[in-house]
A protein has these predicted regions:
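A short helix->beta-strand "capping" segment at the edge of beta-propeller domains
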Residues: 33-47
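WD40/WD-repeat beta-propeller blade N-cap
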Residues: 45-52, 88-94, 130-136, 172-178, ...
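Short coil/turn segments within WD40 beta-propeller repeats
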Residues: 50-53, 70-74, 92, 112-115, ...
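Residue-level detector of Asp-centered blade-edge/turn motifs that repeat once per structural unit
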Residues: 59-60, 101-102, 143-144, 185-186, ...
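Blade-level signature of beta-propeller repeat domains, shared across WD40, Kelch, NHL, RCC1
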Residues: 305-331
Length: 331
């Protein structure tokens, strides 16, 4: 009888342990919940006849600009998906688009060796910037709206006065073509990524190189500042995204696990998540503090070339080689 009671007590203890483990396992962890997100297809925007190479949200989040290999830029209503304007003027592929901070203008660069500044409301060309035979591969507007930066095939970065189109400064330091450029949120610094596999952070006013960030093993395709300006994300043909400390140049995280080349990275407004575009026909969301966290959303039928978060962080736009733009809802 005593042995039976002892055995029953053991069973009771074991059951209590199991129930306790189940309770702990099912309990919600607020910190974990904060890191969870979901991405759902909202709408597909059709209007381009060739690959969509670049997408960019207007500062108020109401419009979207897309640049395509059909030589055009399209302005979309982000809420309805309606085509508002088709900007025609480039003679060859459009490879990069960006909005001015006040939302009045869109800048685009093309394989036709021109940069065009457009009136976003009327669709008219405001001015055309040229550098002879020097092609510009990426454009980025300064936060104050006064300057436009362009990375070029001549291994340098040109800074234009956006108000009159005058070239005011050239930044030299890369040993190969500059594929991507991005201004820091405070406008003091510029980041550039090159075919030479390096990222350079520049002091724009002084025109000097502050840091050279080495770590990628192939051509850089995209650089993007965190909203607070403390970190920089870069994506490359080596299929990796690297997070850098923008002050020291130290690597703080390497986000791997992508199957193919990384073409575009975009930081969410919360500073915790990155959107990534790769050779795969999908959009990838990454937690910048957890390299194991990967979420994928499928919707495109061709390589995803560009991703861009809306200013409020609730939507994401992607452009791809299936000639479409997709808007995603993100929670």
């Amino acid at each position: 009888m005593q042995e039976k009671n002892t055995e029953m007590n053991r069973i009771k203890v074991l059951m209590l342990v199991i129930f306790a483990a189940l309770f702990v396992g099912c309990e919600n962890n607020p910190e974990d919940e904060d890191e969870l997100f979901s991405i759902k297809h909202a709408k597909t925007l059709e209007g381009h006849t060739e690959w969509v190479y670049s997408v960019s949200w207007s500062p108020d989040g109401k419009k979207l600009a897309s640049g395509s290999w059909d030589n055009t830029v399209i302005i979309w209503d982000a809420n309805t998906g309606a085509k508002l304007k088709t900007l025609e003027g480039h003679r060859w592929y459009v490879i990069s688009v960006c909005w001015s901070p006040d939302g009045k203008y869109v800048a685009s660069c093309s394989e036709d060796k021109t940069v065009i500044i457009w009136d976003a409301n009327t669709g008219e060309q405001v001015r055309t910037l040229e550098r002879g035979d020097n092609r510009v591969l990426s454009v980025s507007w300064s936060p104050d709206g006064n300057y436009l930066a362009g990375g070029s095939v001549e291994n340098d970065i040109v800074i234009w006065d956006a108000n009159n189109g005058q070239e005011i400064k050239t930044l030299e330091g890369h040993s190969d073509r500059v594929i991507t450029v991005s201004w820091s949120p405070d406008g003091r610094y510029l980041a550039s990524g090159s075919k030479d596999k390096n990222v350079i952070i520049w002091d724009v006013n002084a025109g000097t190189e502050l840091l050279t960030l080495e770590g990628h093993t192939n051509t850089l395709n995209s650089v993007c500042w965190s909203p607070d300006g403390k970190h920089l994300a870069s994506g490359a043909y080596d299929a990796n995204v690297i997070i850098w400390d923008a002050k020291t140049g130290a690597k703080t995280q390497i986000l791997d696990g992508h199957n193919f080349s990384v073409y575009s990275v975009s930081w969410n407004a919360d500073g915790k998540h990155l959107a990534v575009a790769t050779t795969d026909p999908e959009v990838i969301l990454r937690d910048v503090n957890n390299r194991e966290s990967i979420q994928k959303a499928k919707g495109h039928f061709g390589t995803t070339r560009s991703v861009s978060w809306s200013p409020d962080g609730k939507k994401l736009a992607s452009g791809a080689c299936d000639n479409t733009v997709i808007i995603w809802n993100v929670k």
